[in-house]
Amino acid sequence: MNFQEFRNKWFDLGCISPDQIYSWRPDFDKNNISNWSKKGLIIKLRNGFYLFPEHKTRSGFAFYVANRIYRPSYISLHSALAFYGMIPESVVQITSVTSRKTATFSNAIGEFSYKTIKPDLMFGYDVKPIDEGHSFLLAKPEKALIDLLYLYPFYNTKFEIEELRLDMDFIQNDLNKNLLKEYSKQIDCKALEKRVKLII
């Protein structure tokens, strides 16, 4: 198989794994992946996941990659807060939560960070389309905030909350406070409920 045939088959998918390739061509030579990666024809994201470089700068595609290379997961915490304009800082890492163990990956796309939460706390996210065939899972604003307060318990005073530099216009006018309270109660953590009250 030459690279052009490979590209024609998998380019639209964007992020691919050898398992997918072997299901298509059981006799596929795994050395092709290594050779094409060395030539820059594909980008290694982590063991078992590759990306065509043309997708590297596509808007929103880094979030799609984040979902793909470590499942199950969804974009949350600082990346989600920045996406909604709730915090002013640009976020260097792409932050997600997962029911798997905490992990980080660094590649040509960026740095990906995953924080562990319990499987029954994997809720409160939406499917965000990028284009036809590509989408990513993103925490709702309320769940991104809940995930942050749950995973970073040092945000337990007014001063620490202020250090987040949350957009108060968003908090007052756009944040669904009833949903925030509902998520907090669903997690059933008294310390978390106290931290939520510092915001609302």
Roles of regions detected by a PLM:
Residues 1-72:
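Short beta-edge/loop segments at beta->alpha junctions of small alpha/beta modules
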Residues 20, 53-200:
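Nucleic-acid-binding surface
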